[in-house]
């Protein structure tokens, strides 16, 4: 009997040691995994922090906290949009169509509807539509709008402008971009931040971005003359076809297939001086595209050089994509110059 008890004790002791060995092994493996995960997270956070220009994580956290509390003291200007229910439902329908499709197509989703904009106690008639191409412009309760003022009304000196989630333009980065361009004599858009309410609901802080009108030229001390681009409609139709898995020829949606055109072309062509400048500008764009003339023959090379240098500085490569870039025709030098956008 004592022998059996001794054997039982030895078996229990062996099992106990085996359990602790397994437990220690599991704890060791778990610890290694946790340390590995924390190392990866730390590395990712450090990489993100460095990409934002901070030397270490603490500087980043300290700045974010400081900026947050500074932001609570801000008192941005406010506008109020009133959209009748019938018109609001049209916007909702267009928004849902674009979300289902995966891209905003202006011919399908760009219907302007009447509304009222109130600013500093003054109510002004406007027309607005959904704005943008990518669906980040259609976030819940943060839709982007293109707005055009009616008659002689102006908002902050602008006849046409957009309001959009600041994140669609990199928050403060876009404001800095335009300020730098303006300082170097490049045509720059008015770009501000405001608080927006829609039908009595606060939709938060929006970025206001000027559109391409004569007021833009006046604000940049330029003579009235065409602002031009290469029409990107075929490019976006091609993007839509790709989303639908429809085969199409990419060459029909490239820079070489896009028609050069001017903003407010129909209105401008009624003015003989504007029309003459328009024809000169189109000829320059076509000659440059077909490589019949050099870049320096088509552009104010000093302004173009500064434009590209600043784009490199701020990482704004999207501004030189052919579907985004805009040009102004200088009627004195008979050359094109870039418009910051």
Language-model features: locations:
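Phosphate/dinucleotide-binding and metal-coordinating scaffold of catalytic cores
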Residues: 2-341
């Amino acid at each position: 009997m004592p022998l059996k008890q001794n054997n039982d004790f030895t078996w229990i002791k062996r099992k106990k040691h085996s359990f602790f060995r397994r437990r220690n092994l599991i704890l060791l493996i778990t610890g290694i995994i946790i340390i590995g995960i924390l190392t990866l997270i730390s590395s990712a956070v450090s990489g993100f922090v460095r990409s934002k220009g901070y030397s270490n994580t603490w500087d980043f956290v300290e700045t974010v906290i400081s900026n947050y509390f500074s932001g609570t003291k801000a008192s941005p200007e406010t506008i109020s949009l009133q959209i009748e229910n019938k018109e609001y439902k049209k916007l909702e329908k267009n928004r849902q169509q674009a979300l289902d499709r995966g891209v905003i197509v202006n011919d399908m989703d760009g219907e302007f509807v009447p509304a009222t904009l109130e600013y500093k106690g003054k109510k002004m008639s406007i027309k607005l539509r959904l704005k943008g191409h990518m669906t980040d412009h259609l976030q819940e309760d943060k839709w982007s709008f293109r707005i055009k003022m009616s008659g002689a009304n102006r908002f902050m000196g602008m006849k046409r402008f957009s309001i959009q989630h600041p994140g669609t333009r990199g928050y403060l980065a876009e404001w800095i971009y335009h300020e730098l361009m303006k300082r170097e004599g490049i045509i720059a858009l008015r770009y501000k931040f405001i608080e927006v309410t829609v039908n009595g609901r606060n939709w938060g802080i929006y970025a206001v971005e000027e559109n391409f009108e004569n007021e833009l030229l006046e604000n940049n001390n330029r003579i009235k003359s065409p602002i031009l681009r290469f029409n990107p409609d075929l490019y976006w139709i091609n993007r839509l076809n790709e989303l639908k898995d429809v085969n199409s020829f990419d060459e029909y949606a490239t820079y070489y297939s896009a028609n050069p055109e001017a903003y407010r072309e129909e209105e401008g062509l009624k003015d003989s001086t504007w029309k003459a400048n328009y024809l000169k500008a189109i000829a320059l764009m076509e000659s440059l595209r077909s490589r019949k003339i050099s870049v320096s023959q088509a552009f104010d090379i000093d302004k173009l050089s500064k434009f590209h240098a600043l784009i490199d500085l701020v990482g704004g490569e999207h501004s030189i994509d052919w579907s985004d870039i805009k040009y102004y025709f200088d009627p004195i030098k008979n050359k094109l110059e870039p418009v910051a956008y």
